[in-house]
């Protein structure tokens, strides 16, 4: 009875066929008496791939059709079936091994559903890696083995047999299941299984040996992220604990200390701990030995990235920031680089990194921190953690409201216009602005960044270098992740994906609810059959003689009218099967037009003038009659039997009255006045001329309107393009202003460095002069007189013990090279005695002179 208030009513057509109640009773009796030989008898049959023969052989009914064991030829049983199914649909047990999917379906919010956790033998479950990456609702497939040693943990939920009457999200889940699975009946309920031979070879199936998704989910989530971060290994090891090699590579790549998160999350390093035996997995859902509250640093880092992407509205509104690096997150990262990363970081996405590499992590988180500090400067945010989603979105809303940027948007986020305005209004703020510093709360600054002020960090923290980012963070959730100092973030705005690990899949008594519903349906069935057998024959026999002549005169018109549509639903068991009354009503309602209709005043309006009918409708026949208050003063004792003949005649009278009113309305719309014999042709010709003129004007103005709409669309498109170009110019101008300010700072730094270098040169010169090194000092001093310069050079060259400067001058002098050449030529003459050498030397000498 618990399900009766919330399940939709109506005669539905099920997706499973059936014949008779005897077959269903045989199946239920078989379910009660099945023993351990169930899998031995049917294992060979199902192992060959004939999973669904049981549907065709037993033909179990899921819609309630022929549920009560009577043939469809019996009209009594047909009405019993329709009314019973519409009010109280039969229930059955359905087993779902995917506990995570049930949690995402908000199983706990359905107050009328009863469910329990059970163990099923003879089945195996597999995780489909691609479905997890695509965030499908169903990520498991179930396979039948027939081996009693293979056990899985599932949730048994009591739902209507007719799947079209399931709650909305459960119906969508059923449609998704039916794309790759088919139902199989077991003693404990219906289970949806998949033939592994029909699974696509491109899917990676991960066998869950323990049979419980909750046992291996944390390890799978960490390994799945490590694999997508290019830190993990093969897909076959995704269900094992993460290896030290993968964790070390992750720590080295993203600068997260290994000893810190090993000490904080010791359950991740389980290489030395053996797996639990299979018999202990039965109670693993309620096991307290596993710490499900802790979160891996790998998952936490991906969660921070997903929260950052949600600030830019790159993820859907209902997206769960659960730390699972899926395809939607990768797509959002690529879109962020194209829209924001290139503009504010001044670099392209690295091609030698994965989608979420160190450069992306540093750039995305640093941009969020930069915006956070700028919002703090504008006194728009009060949250102590930039990854407190509610506080950060409130800060964005305050800033947009302050500058009039949130007039048309339904959702608050960091759009390009808001970022441009944020960088523009905070660019002129310097670190010496005492008024801005006074507006900031000191505790907030110390909690988030520890040292330094947000004005400096709002300019310095924007980087693509992970080391620079880590150096500039000292608290909050990012500080807790990278340095172990800070407070954990608030996760009240989203439902964690790991909450299903702690959810209690136990409510009510499913067996008791099914038994109660079956007893109630059986009671209704017996009562209605007894009532039908008692009254149907009497009503049919009494009305057959009276209605046979009227039925012979009726037109053969199909009708879907039933007794339930005539009577108020006070007691269905009493009025459901008055078949004689039903036939009398149909005979009266579908009676052909004959002379007796003139007596019952059904067609009174046919014989009246339509012009007078409108005036007649406004007349007052009676007033202050006692019959007007009779229903209020005199109480009716319900139930009472209305007159079906009166109902049929009233319906016909209403039908013809409505038709007459429609006819009158049509005449009023086209009424032109009374025409006489003399003015008939003239008025009609004048009307036709005016009508044609109106048609021409309408066509003319409609063509003009189309031309105007086309021009309007062109102008609108040009305006949109112009606005887009203006936005790009504004963003480029803001970026140029920002770069010019940075360039000015760099120029001032260079000028100061040059001045320091000049001062150092002056000091060096003075020190050399003090030491008495006149040669060097004279070389350093500029010579304005040419004679003095030549004399200084000659002194340096003729010095007996020259210093390094004089030696260089001697080497570079022309006379030194000439002497060296003459000596070389003399040696060659003495050795070879060849005049050609002398001639060549003379030519070389002339060339040197030239």
From Swiss-Prot:
Keywords: Phosphoprotein. The modification Phosphoserine is found at residues 594, 625. The keyword Phosphoprotein applies. The keyword Phosphoprotein applies. GO terms for cellular component: Sin3-type complex. Interacts with SIN3. To yeast STB6. This is Protein STB2. It comes from Saccharomyces cerevisiae (strain ATCC 204508 / S288c) (Baker's yeast).
